C-alpha cells in the first residue's frame, strides 16, 4: 500500500491544490516522533488569508483514516503518523506476493533507445568507459521495470579523424606480428606514440588527416586496416562486457551511418538551413551562439553530422518515445546543437532526446587521459577487484562453496556499485581498497546483508520454521523501520526512472541494509514463539527487495558469502 498517496488523497479532499503539487510539498519530519509525513500549510496562507497554523489545525480536524494512528496539526504542519501494524502487514503482504515484481509499474510504454558505453575502436576500455556503461545498463533495467522497452545501443567510435592518425601511426611504426599477438595494446601504443611525436612534428597531423580523407573516399588499404582494427577491438570489448554482465541490442557505430550523412546534408540544404562560413558548411544556432559545423572546410564530416543521421535513422527504425544519450558532461554543448538542429529541421520528437550526463572518475584527484597514456584499464581493475574480494572471502568464510563465482560477483559488483552510488553528475575518486570493503557504504556490504538474510532463512528452515504467508503480527520499532523502507521501494524505482538516476536505488539499498542490520542486531529473529513466522517474512521481504535493488544496478546478489 502507498501511504504517501493516501496522504495526498486526504489533503486533496480539504485543499484546492492539484495532487501533483501536494505530492511535491509532502515532507518527511526529521524527528520520527513528529510522524511519518507532514504537509506544510504555508502555501495556502496567501490565498486563504489565514495563519498557516490555523489552516493546519482546520485540515487536521477534518481528516480521518484507519491507516494512520494519528493525524494532528503541529504548528503550520499537518503531521501524519502511520499505523505501524498496518504498514508492516500491508507491505509484507505486497512484497511476498509480488516477489521480484514488487515495484513494477506502468509509468509509460514504447521504445527507449539508450546510447551508452561507446568506446573507441583500437583503444583498450578504460575506467573512463565504466560510467557510461553501468549507468546506461542500470537505466535500461529500471526503464523496463516501469513499462518501457529499452534498446541498448553501443554507438562504437569506429569512425573519425582518429582513424587517420592510427593508420598513419601504423604505417610509421606498426608491426603486423605484434598486432596479431596483442592487438589492442599494440594499437594503443601506436596511438599514444603518434600524439607524443606529433607534439614535435606537426606534419604527422597532416598525414593523419590525409589518411582519414582516404578512408572516407574508400581507399582499399585504408578500409582494410580500419576493418581489421575494428574486428580485434570489438572482440576484446565483448569479453569485458561479459565480465560486467552487460549486453547490447545494437553495435551500430559511427561507420554504420557513413552513407546516411549525405542525405542529411542535402535535407539541410533543401530546408535552407545550411550556409557557408569560413569554408565550412554550418547551421546558425542563434545570435549569441557559434554556428553548428556540419561539413568542415576540408570537406570531411564531423561528429554532429553522424549524430543527426543516427537520430533520424533511429526514429525511423524504433519509433522511440524517448532517446537517451549516456555521455559525459563535457559533451553538453554537442547535444544542445543536436537537438536544436533537429528542431530547426522540423522534428518535434527532438524534445524527447535527453542527454544523460555524468561526472568524471579520478584517481588521486587527477583526470584519466587516454591520449597521454596515463590510463587505468578497466579489465585490470576488474581482475584486481575480484582478487581482492576472493582474499577477503577466504579469510571470512574459507569453506564457502563456489568461491570463484562469489568473488567475481562481489569484486565486479563492488566496482559497479561504487560508480552508481555516486550522484550521476558528481566527480569521484576511485580507490580499490575502499571500493571492495565489506563494511561501509559499499556494494559488498549490501551483498553481505542479503547473504545474512538468506542465512537466517536457511537456519529457520533447518528448525522447521518458514516465513508467514498471512499473519504479520510484529510491531517493534526495528521492524517498522525496515518495513517503511520496503514500502518506499516502488516510489524509489519511479524516482530513479524519472530522473535517469541509478544512485537513488543504490542509496536506498544501503539504507535498507543498514536498517536490516540494526533489526538483526536488536531482535532475536529465530526465537520460537508466535511471531517467528512474521519475523521471517520480514527477513524474506528484505532479501527480495535487496536482490531486486542490486539487479536494477547490474549487480549480482550471492546467497552465501
UniProtKB/Swiss-Prot annotation:
UniProt key word Nucleotide-binding: yes
Cellular component GO terms, alphabetical: cytoplasm
UniProt-recorded Gene Ontology molecular function terms: arginine-tRNA ligase activity; ATP binding
Motif 'HIGH' region, residue range(s) on this chain: 119-129
SUPFAM superfamilies the UniProt entry points to: Anticodon-binding domain of a subclass of class I aminoacyl-tRNA synthetases, Arginyl-tRNA synthetase (ArgRS), N-terminal 'additional' domain, Nucleotidylyl transferase
Catalysed reaction, written as an equation: tRNA(Arg) + L-arginine + ATP = L-arginyl-tRNA(Arg) + AMP + diphosphate
Keywords: Aminoacyl-tRNA synthetase, ATP-binding, Cytoplasm, Ligase, Nucleotide-binding, Protein biosynthesis
The keyword Protein biosynthesis is assigned to this record: yes
EC number(s) stated in the UniProt entry for this protein: 6.1.1.19
Organism, as annotated: Lactobacillus acidophilus (strain ATCC 700396 / NCK56 / N2 / NCFM)
CDD domains: Anticodon_Ia_Arg, ArgRS_core
Main location: cytoplasm
Lineage summary: Bacteria, Bacillati, Bacillota, Bacilli, Lactobacillales
Protein's cellular compartments: Cytoplasm
Record's subunit section: Monomer.
Protein name from the UniProt record: Arginine--tRNA ligase
UniProt family annotation: Belongs to the class-I aminoacyl-tRNA synthetase family.
GO biological process: arginyl-tRNA aminoacylation
Amino acid at each position: 500500500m502507498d501511504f504517501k498517496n493516501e496522504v495526498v488523497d486526504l489533503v486533496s479532499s480539504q485543499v484546492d491544490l492539484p495532487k501533483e503539487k501536494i505530492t511535491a510539498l509532502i515532507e518527511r519530519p526529521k524527528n520520527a516522533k513528529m510522524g511519518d509525513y507532514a504537509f506544510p500549510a504555508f502555501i495556502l496562507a496567501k490565498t486563504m488569508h489565514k495563519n498557516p497554523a490555523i489552516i493546519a489545525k482546520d485540515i487536521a480536524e477534518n481528516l480521518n483514516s484507519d491507516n494512520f494512528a494519528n493525524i494532528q496539526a503541529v504548528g503550520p504542519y499537518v503531521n501524519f503518523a502511520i499505523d505501524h501494524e498496518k504498514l508492516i502487514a500491508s507491505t509484507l503482504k505486497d512484497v511476498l506476493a509480488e516477489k521480484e515484481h514488487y515495484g513494477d509499474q506502468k509509468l509509460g510504454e514504447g521504445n527507449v533507445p539508450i546510447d551508452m558505453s561507446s568506446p573507441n575502436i583500437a583503444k583498450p576500455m578504460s575506467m573512463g568507459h565504466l560510467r557510461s556503461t553501468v549507468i546506461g545498463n542500470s537505466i535500461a533495467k529500471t526503464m523496463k521495470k516501469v513499462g518501457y522497452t529499452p534498446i541498448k545501443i553501443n554507438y562504437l567510435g569506429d569512425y573519425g579523424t582518429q582513424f587517420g592518425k592510427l593508420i598513419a601511426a601504423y604505417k610509421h611504426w606498426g608491426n603486423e606480428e605484434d598486432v596479431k599477438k596483442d592487438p589492442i595494446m599494440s594499437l594503443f601504443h601506436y596511438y599514444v606514440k603518434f600524439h607524443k611525436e606529433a607534439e614535435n612534428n606537426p606534419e604527422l597531423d597532416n598525414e593523419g588527416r590525409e589518411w582519414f580523407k582516404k578512408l572516407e573516399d574508400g581507399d582499399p588499404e585504408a578500409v582494410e586496416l580500419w576493418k581489421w582494427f575494428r574486428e580485434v577491438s570489438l572482440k576484446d570489448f565483448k569479453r569485458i562486457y561479459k565480465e560486467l554482465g552487460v549486453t547490447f541490442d545494437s553495435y551500430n557505430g559511427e561507420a554504420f551511418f557513413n552513407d546516411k550523412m549525405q542525405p542529411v546534408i542535402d535535407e539541410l540544404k533543401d530546408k535552407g538551413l545550411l550556409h557557408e562560413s569560413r569554408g565550412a558548411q554550418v547551421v546558425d544556432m542563434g545570435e549569441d551562439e557559434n554556428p553548428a559545423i556540419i561539413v568542415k572546410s576540408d570537406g570531411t564530416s564531423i561528429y554532429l553530422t553522424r549524430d543527426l543521421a543516427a537520430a533520424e535513422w533511429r526514429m525511423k527504425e524504433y519509433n522511440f518515445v524517448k532517446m537517451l544519450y549516456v555521455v559525459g558532461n563535457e559533451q553538453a554543448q554537442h547535444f544542445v546543437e543536436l537537438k536544436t538542429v533537429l528542431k530547426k529541421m522540423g522534428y518535434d520528437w527532438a524534445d524527447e532526446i535527453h542527454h544523460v550526463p555524468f561526472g568524471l572518475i579520478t584517481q588521486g584527484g587527477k583526470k584519466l587521459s587516454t591520449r597521454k597514456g596515463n590510463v587505468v584499464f578497466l579489465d585490470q581493475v576488474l581482475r584486481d577487484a575480484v582478487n581482492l574480494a576472493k582474499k577477503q572471502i577466504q579469510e571470512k568464510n574459507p569453506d564457502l562453496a563456489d568461491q570463484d563465482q562469489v568473488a567475481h560477483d562481489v569484486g565486479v559488483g563492488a566496482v559497479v556499485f561504487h560508480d552508481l552510488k555516486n550522484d550521476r553528475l558528481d566527480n569521484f575518486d576511485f580507490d580499490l581498497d575502499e571500493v571492495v570493503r565489506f563494511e561501509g557504504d559499499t556494494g559488498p556490504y549490501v551483498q553481505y546483508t542479503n547473504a545474512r538474510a538468506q542465512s537466517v532463512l536457511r537456519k529457520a528452515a533447518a528448525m522447521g520454521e518458514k516465513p508467514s504467508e498471512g499473519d504479520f503480527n510484529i510491531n517493534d520499532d526495528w521492524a517498522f523501520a525496515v518495513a517503511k523502507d520496503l514500502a518506499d521501494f516502488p516510489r524509489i524505482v519511479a524516482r530513479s526512472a524519472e530522473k535517469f538516476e541509478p544512485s537513488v536505488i543504490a542509496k536506498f539499498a544501503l539504507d535498507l541494509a543498514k536498517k536490516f542490520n540494526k533489526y538483526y542486531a536488536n531482535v532475536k529473529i529465530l526465537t520460537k514463539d508466535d511471531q517467528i513466522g512474521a519475523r521471517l517474512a520480514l527477513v524474506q521481504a528484505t532479501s527480495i527487495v535487496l536482490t531486486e535493488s542490486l539487479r536494477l544496478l547490474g549487480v549480482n546478489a550471492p546467497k552465501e558469502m
